[in-house]
Amino acid sequence: MVKLNKDYTKLDEDYLFFEIEKRAAFFVKKSLCNLGIGDITLAIPEVITEAICSATKELQEEKTLRGYGPSQGYLFLREAIQKNEYINIPITEDEIFVQNGIKNAISSLQDLFCKTSYVAVCDPTYPVYVDSNVMAGRENIEYLPCLEENGFLPTLPQKNVDLIYICSPNNPTGVAFTRKDLKKWVDFAKKQNALIFFDGAYEAFITSDDVPHSIYEIPGADEVAIEFRSFSKSAGFTGLRCSYLVLPKKLKTEDGFSIHKFYKRHIDTKYGGTSYPIQRGAERCFTEDGKKALERNLNIYRSGAKMLREGLISLDYKVFGGTHSPYIWCKTKNEMSSWDFFDLLLKKAQIIAIPGSGFGRCGEGFIRFSAFANQKTIETALNNLEKVTL
Amino acid sequence: MVKLNKDYTKLDEDYLFFEIEKRAAFFVKKSLCNLGIGDITLAIPEVITEAICSATKELQEEKTLRGYGPSQGYLFLREAIQKNEYINIPITEDEIFVQNGIKNAISSLQDLFCKTSYVAVCDPTYPVYVDSNVMAGRENIEYLPCLEENGFLPTLPQKNVDLIYICSPNNPTGVAFTRKDLKKWVDFAKKQNALIFFDGAYEAFITSDDVPHSIYEIPGADEVAIEFRSFSKSAGFTGLRCSYLVLPKKLKTEDGFSIHKFYKRHIDTKYGGTSYPIQRGAERCFTEDGKKALERNLNIYRSGAKMLREGLISLDYKVFGGTHSPYIWCKTKNEMSSWDFFDLLLKKAQIIAIPGSGFGRCGEGFIRFSAFANQKTIETALNNLEKVTL
């Protein structure tokens, strides 16, 4: 009989967010303040749902029917992305790949590279980066500590590395790389001949000119970086599923292979494309009315993050992030562990948050709050928290 | 710099269907009779598009908004599948996993198993089975010849094998396994402790009671088989994207691991779920009005397959399949090679078909016609073909 790929046994039993669901399952869900998983809570603007319905109705007529779409995504969407997100940046529509979500894309892309590659990830980090590399049998993983003393920004790796995962604005810490910070990493990758996986899932939350939205704003990044973007957080597509990645044609492996070419081969074999009506919904995000509607929602989330951040500070918590990000990284009090603080929040304040240690060892002593919640939930959470004595 | 995963260099340059697109690109597309890639051509029934639009509109209201869905798919759809497709078969909703397409599911599932596993595939076969195993570094691939003399049904492997890919009704040959044929394989898998990947993408085309729709109709198959199904061909979802797989909890690896448990871990890490409105569209396929509408479309495709099959026979071609399948497997005349016949059909008869040799060595000398075309296209194709002198 077939044997298991033993690399799978090296994973934790459960994916982090399911462990949290399990623990929360003992409470009445409706009375809990969910500041846990980063899922959207504001309705999707009508301008977007209309675009999806209108595209769906095209399929009920033979003359406008569409079957299999291009595995790379429809040109209309790739052009809209290029024209709106990569103005004055040397990225062409042919370097954009539309997909079903960053999780799927970023966890599969590593398959293209040699199994003995050295990988650098931040600690704490989004668990998918590490888990997908463990599943692929990679053992050479360098964890880059992101600590209070370095402002939660990683320091450059000590060893030679081949693949570097960077997420900015960061999940879970909410901290964003400035242009200067990011340039240091692009220069390092060039010098080291390393490839950066740049996860920009939260770029819509950036509020300062000093923080780049795209890694390609840094000169030369198109020789060393692949960028991931999503409609999940910017447009509420967590349940609709649409994302994209940017893979410049200039990218070559050390052994001289075009990464673009092999990635195309990879998706042609392993990927059936993204739902057509959903791609039309994503396209609508770039029209004037689409942009306005999304901006209204983003502003509500931003206000929520501000309220949560300031509320926590007024309760004497030390907090980070929450400015360019929907996430607030909060230090526990009295050196309480992340999971103890999680249990306390759940039992005494009816709050779900995500224990920092779930994102890596260096996350111990912290908890992640998500501001994807309505104002009332955040207010209730802060009121409940005020009553908790530590 | 990161090096390429060298297993990728063992693949053909282009995925088969893109090579065909390239060759067809020199012709005016509108005047070609496309009997090539198996893509639907009939409009999607309104009852389905309505379900998708109605679910989409739920998302524009906060009280009916849904964000991230369960990675395994919504219970409403898994229950509908179980109640309609697995009546009197010991499969529970918890053993069903909703996904974006069989291609993605079947190409990823092999990741769960040991890299040195022995794989058996039919020759000819759907290229994704082989390519995904090559990408994973598997070198022990046994090709099972499916030839005219064995009715295009594979004979049992000579060596010990761990993973067996079976597609019935078959792509590309259009031939279906009877209950007796399939039982032989289930028994073999049991004896050998092998795991069967059973691709049932075309089960909706089965017209005889003698041909099982599900491998689990064979007693004991739930100990040795994973089944893949899709809404692509049965309901026209090629552009909408929805499929599912059935993974019984009884399945264990030789080393005693629960495949269900590790697959759940796999998708939790690597998969963000299927679009909610599309899952509602799929659910609607199982209502009375949904079933009727789909049956109408299927009957049109079936008539097309019959017309094409009979037309080819009347032109003295030797054909197989086309009864339980939208595909007709046609022998070339005068021992012409598959690609020569492809070029001839393209240049002299304005027909696109798929060269049999593209599906494997044993496909040489054959061509695959798809009956996913309207009646007029099939008529024109047959008329054009009649004029071709060989």
Predicted regions and their residues:
Chain A
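Conserved core segment of the aminotransferase class I/II
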Residues: I218-N299, K306, E310, V388
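Generic structural signal for small/hydrophobic residues in well-ordered secondary structure
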Residues: I20, L35, I52, I81, ...
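Conserved PLP-binding catalytic core of the aspartate aminotransferase-like
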Residues: A43, Y301-R302, L315-K348
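Conserved core of the PLP fold type I
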Residues: K63-A189, E203-I218
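Conserved glycine-rich beta-strand-loop-beta hairpin in the small C-terminal domain of fold type I
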Residues: Q279, E283, L298-R309, V319-K331, ...
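PLP-dependent enzyme catalytic core of the Aspartate aminotransferase-like
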Residues: P90, E335, L344-I354, G358-L390
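N-terminal small-domain helix-loop-helix segment of the aminotransferase-like
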Residues: K3-G101, S108, C285-E288, L390
